[in-house]
Amino acid sequence: EHADVKRMLLAQKAYAEGALALQLYCARLVDEQHTGDEAAQKDAALLLDVLTPIAKSWPSEWCLEGNSLAIQVHGGYGYTRDFPVEQYWRDQRLNMIHEGTHGIQALDLLGRKVTMDGGAGLKLLASRISATTERAGHVEGFATHANALAAALQSLGAATKAAWATGVPE
């Protein structure tokens, strides 16, 4: 009924479902490391190495934002013990600490995982994303989103190159 409440609820849904999808994809990669042919196992290991710091930091940050929105949706009542969202917020805030600080995860990703094996993991991830955007670009209603994702991938590549331009990504 209220547009702003609807926006906050949809954002929470997107954060939670996106985090779950990322975790399930990583779980699938764990399984694929031990099944299939040797090339598929190697690809799964490379992708998992690149995605692990992201899988640790992204959900902890954005699901905390989702919890903050839940408190807002409750009009502040969620910050009291009337609703469990205040406990969820505290628990979620600890996830950012338990999974390692975002700075540590960023250094791991940019300092080690991106350059590992000559950048093979990031190149494989980029090729998978590109293949997905190519397929999605031909599906009615998805082209705009596919183009946005392709542009974001280009920006990621440029940002990664810029970070490494000095030789030390800090």
Residue spans of the language-model regions?
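Flavin-dependent oxidoreductase catalytic core characteristic
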Residues: 1-170
